[in-house]
């Protein structure tokens, strides 16, 4: 993952980070699937009905990053595949997590 890839989907915001996401609901399982148009693509097993996909996304991000769910907030795109999520975690920790996810991604 290049620095420009990292800058495109992850930036510092106050005491945390902003993460740009491209979400694909109704997948077989919840997992990261590389970068897509400057955002981390996440496949979600949940359907996009009654906020279930957003709830699954928040739970997956919180568990993956080791933060409470209350520290993950969907700021933009609640009803869209493109989302902007604020996470109360250090930029270094988020960048290391993202690098680990994308290490083998194309």
Identify what each model region corresponds to.
Residues 1-59, 63-69, 73-79, 84-106:
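Contiguous, often N-terminal, cationic amphipathic patches that form binding interfaces
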């Amino acid at each position: 993952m290049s620095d420009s890839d990292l800058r495109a989907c992850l930036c510092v915001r106050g005491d945390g980070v902003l993460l740009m996401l491209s979400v694909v609901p109704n997948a077989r399982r919840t997992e990261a699937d590389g970068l897509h148009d400057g955002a981390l693509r996440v496949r979600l097993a949940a359907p996009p009905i009654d906020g279930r996909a957003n709830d699954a996304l928040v739970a997956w991000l919180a568990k993956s990053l080791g933060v409470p769910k209350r520290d993950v907030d969907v700021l933009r795109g609640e009803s869209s595949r493109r989302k902007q999520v604020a996470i109360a975690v250090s930029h270094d920790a988020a960048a290391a997590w993202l690098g680990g996810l994308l290490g083998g991604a194309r």
